Amino acid sequence: MAETTTKDDKPLFGRPWIFIRGVPSMKFLPPEGPAEIAFAGRSNVGKSSLINALVGHKGLARTSNTPGRTQELNYFVPDGYSGEADDLPPMALVDMPGYGYAQAPKEQVDAWTKLVFDYLRGRSTLKRVYVLIDARHGIKKNDEEVLALLDKAAVSYQIVLTKTDKIKAAGVPRLIAETLDKIKKRPAAYPEVLSTSSEKGAGIEDLRITIEQAVAR
C-alpha cells in the first residue's frame, strides 16, 4: 500500500505560502501554537523581498521603495492552513514594521514601535528574530536599540546582512567579521552572521536551513 502524504509532511519551504492576516495591534494576533519566525529591520532594509525569496514567491510580501510601507505585523503560513485554532500551521513567518523611518507622523511611528516591542516581549511562540542589516550601511543606532531590547527580553536573534550584491564581494567577509565583533557580548545574539542577496538569491538556502533548525528546537 502506498504511503499517504499529508500537508504536514511536506518540507517547510517546498510548498506555496500565503498571507493570512495583518495585525495592527496585539489583540488581533493569531492563536499561539506554531513556531513563529520574525523579521525586523530598518525601513527599506529589504524584509519583504527577503521573505519572497525565502518562499520562492516574488509577490507574496508586498515590496515598496517607499520606507514605512509595512505598518502591521504581517503573517505568512504554508498554503493549506488557515492559521485558526483548529487549523494551525507548522510555522509562521512574521514581517514586522520597519523602524527608523523619520518621515511618518510621530503618532504613527509610536504606534508601530509599541506594536513591535509588545510583540517581541510577549509572544511565547516566537522562536527567533532575524534582524536585517543593510550591507551598505552596517549596524546603526536604531539597530542597536532593537538588539538591546531583544537582549533584555531574552529573545534569540540572528543578524542577516541584506543587499550584499550592492557592495564589493571582497568586502562581505570583512563586514561579517565586523558585525560579529559588535554582537559578541550580546547575550541573545546567535553567534553566526548570514549574508544574503534577495535579488541574486545568494545566502537564501543557508537562511532556510537556519530557520528550520530554529523551529525544530
Swiss-Prot record:
InterPro entries in UniProt = G_ENGB_dom, GTP-bd, GTP-bd_ribosome_bio_YsxC, P-loop_NTPase
Task: List, for all copies, the residue spans of the domain called EngB-type G.
Answer: 33-217
Task: List GO molecular-function terms, semicolon-separated.
Answer: GTP binding; metal ion binding
Query: Cofactors per UniProt?
Result: Mg(2+)
Task: Give binding positions for Mg(2+).
Answer: 48, 70
A GO cellular component annotated for this chain's UniProt record is: cytosol
Pfam family, any one: MMR_HSR1
- State the HAMAP family in the record: GTPase_EngB
Q: What is the protein name stated in its UniProt record? A: Probable GTP-binding protein EngB
